[in-house]
Each structure stands twice: as C-alpha cells, then as structure tokens.
Amino acid sequence: MTLPKIKHVRAWFIGGATAEKGAGGGDYHDQGGNHWIADHIATPMSKYRDYEQSRQSFGINVLGTLIVEVEAENGQTGFAVSTAGEMGCFIVEKHLNRFIEGKCVSDIKLIHDQMLGATMYYSGSGGLVMNTISCVDLALWDLFGKVVGLPVYKLLGGAVRDEIQFYATGARPDLAKEMGFIGGKMPTHWGPHDGDAGIRKDAAMVADMREKCGPDFWLMLDCWMSQDVNYATKLAHACAPFNLKWIEECLPPQQYEGYRELKRNAPAGMMVTSGEHHGTLQSFRTLSETGIDIMQPDVGWCGGLTTLVEIAALAKSRGQLVVPHGSSVYSHHAVITFTNTPFSEFLMTSPDCSTLRPQFDPILLDEPVPVNGRIHKSVLDKPGFGVELNRDCHLKRPYSH
C-alpha cells in the first residue's frame, strides 16, 4: 500500500478571550454560568480574595479550543482538539507547518521529534506550546487511522481488555454511583490560606459523600495545584477515616521534592497522584522517581499520543499506574492498549453532574459516553479516533500560510 503525503495543515479556534464565551469544546473550562467546573474551587489563585470565588475570575478559560486539521494528498483529513486557542493557531500555521506538510502520513514520530526540537527554545517543559504540539500529534494519528482504515487503538497494537471502566470527576459522586461509575473525584474548595478551617470543611465534604455513597465506592480529591506539603499532608490524614482512595495534584507541577515528601507522609493505603499539568517525557521521568502511585498525563497537553505511549512504558517499567486525565476518545484509544491502566477518568461536563454530556461537546460529533460506567472496545472501532469535526461551530481561522 502506497501511503499519501500530507498536503496541508490548518488551525482554527473557538471560544477563549477573543471569541464567544461558554463555547466548551477542547477548552472544557469555557462553560456558561452556574457550572460546577467554574465554581468556588481551590486553585493557586485562591489566596487572592479577588480570584477565589470562581476559576473563570482569574482566566482559566481565556485560551479557548484549538482545532488542528491535517489533509492528505488523497483528500482524506484527520483532526484533533486541545486547549490552546488563537495562540495555538499561530504556532501551527506560522511555525509547525514546515515539519508537517510534505511528510508521509505515517511519519508521526519524525514530525513529533522535529516539533519538539524546533520549539524547545520557547516551550519549556509544557504549557501552551506543548498543548499545540499535542493537538497536531493527535490529528496525525487520526489521519493515519483514517487512511489505513483502522481505529487508533489497533494502530497501537490492539486492546488488552474488552472494555474501559471509568470513575467520574465532578461535584456529585453520589450521582456518579447511580450512573454505574466505579468512583467519584471531587474538587477541593479550600487551601492553605484558609488554615485548619479549610481542612475541616473539605474533610466534612468527603465524610458527607462517604455517607451517601456507602463504604465501597471510591472517593478521591482533586486539589488542582492549590496546596503546600504541610496542608496536603494534614488534609490527607483528615480524610483517611473516610477511606479516601487518593489525593491528587496537591502541589504545583515542578515541586518534585514536595511530592516525594507527601508520598512518604501520606496515610497508609492512600494513594498520591499527579501529572495532569506536566508536559514532556522528561518531566514524567522525574515525577515517577518521587514514588507517587499514579501518573495522570493529559494526552492533549503532555505531547500527544506519541508521548503518552512513552509515559505509559516508563511507568510500567517502574511498576506504576498511568490513568490519563480526561481527554475522551484521545485517551480511550490509548488506555485500552495499556496493561497498567486498569480504569480511566470521565469528566462530568454537565453543569450539575446530573446527566452524561460528552467532554468536548459540541466540537466533536459521535463522541461516546460511558454506559453504566463503561465503554466497550467495539464502540472505538471506527477509523482514526472515530469522531468528526462539528463544522457548525463558529470556527475561526486567524492565520494561514
């Protein structure tokens, strides 16, 4: 089979600070009012009173959704979405395009390595540039799968299990239990600036959900980089009587020594997890050496599927689990091939967590959601990632080449 070359790459955005508010999509923090994900949730900015009531107050939704589409010579297209918005469009159209166009659709690793090397001087170890590279990488995998007529998970070697089971992230673990999920992860609402009173309030929230959900349902806390080691350790011990399964991302990404100390001092049987805001394989190698129990890369932020596969192999060599952060179909096709990912995350994007809404709604068409907390591998059997771009969204292409 002669594979075509890539003819063109294009980049659009929706939402963010320069477009309509509440667009959702790849930037799932960009929601309308009265939504749990934009509510009073602890963040690194919560110590400032002007920015503690809502995550949107400090600008969590300013980037918007980046959409990257790659087109082959035969007219077939692949696409992906992430969080990078208009600035990501500039990086794709004015810099990364030279490494993509003219390459064979199977040259994914070559393109990936060239994108990393060419942006190293302004990308650091993550953030906006890595989100953009991730989006391009995912679009390339989608195109390759569509050209050869295979789902991405089969390109990775095939499924190691028949279905993916999920826990749900949202404000209502009790509703998640009714929907068939294996666990529920809640955001914390208080931080070090709130002192012991904040610890008592979040521990009381866990206690309340334990009473509602019963003794066996998993409960976890997502701390979103908002704590220090001392506070996180106290919170973990305060929640231990309520059988908290893990405490997540308590510290900023680069505080590796802090994670090592937290893991050492956490209650017996409680896991320590992180990785959502780490980018590059190298940062995950350092994170793995802290001894945390689960690494949680976001495939749309860490360097794409190409990097996620490398992270999973690294974790496996150290006996650690990899449970990616959200990411819907882009994670599904990966984790069903990983032997060290026994479950996955589903992010509840309905405002009150009472219904199942696709994570990247409305930008993806045919995006699956779990049924009774599970997705069978047969749901993933369409070529590529199995979804299509909703071109009825207000796509904006600010740059071209």
From Swiss-Prot:
Residues of the site described as Increases basicity of active site His: D298
InterPro entries for the chain: Enolase-like_C_sf, Enolase-like_N, Enolase_C-like, L-Rhamnon_dehydrat, Mandel_Rmase/mucon_lact_enz_CS, Mandelate_racemase_C, Mandelate_racemase_N_dom, RHMD-like
UniProt-listed Pfam families: MR_MLE_C, MR_MLE_N
GO MF term (any one): L-rhamnonate dehydratase activity
Cofactor, how bound (note): Binds 1 Mg(2+) ion per subunit.
Entry EC number(s): 4.2.1.90
Cofactor: Mg(2+)
Annotated active site: H325 (proton acceptor)
Major enzyme class: lyase
UniProt: substrate binding residues: H29, R55, E345
Domain of life where this protein originates: Bacteria
Positions contributing to Mg(2+) binding: D222, E248, E276
Record site: Transition state stabilizer: E345
Keywords: Lyase, Magnesium, Metal-binding
GO biological process per UniProt: amino acid catabolic process; carbohydrate catabolic process
Similarity comment: Belongs to the mandelate racemase/muconate lactonizing enzyme family. RhamD subfamily.
Subunit structure comment from the entry: Homooctamer; tetramer of dimers.
Additional free-text comment from the UniProt record: Reaction proceeds via a syn dehydration.
Purpose of the protein: Catalyzes the dehydration of L-rhamnonate to 2-keto-3-deoxy-L-rhamnonate (KDR).
PANTHER family, sorted: ENOLASE SUPERFAMILY, MANDELATE RACEMASE, MITOCHONDRIAL ENOLASE SUPERFAMILY MEMBER 1
Protein name: L-rhamnonate dehydratase
Gene expressing this chain: rhmD
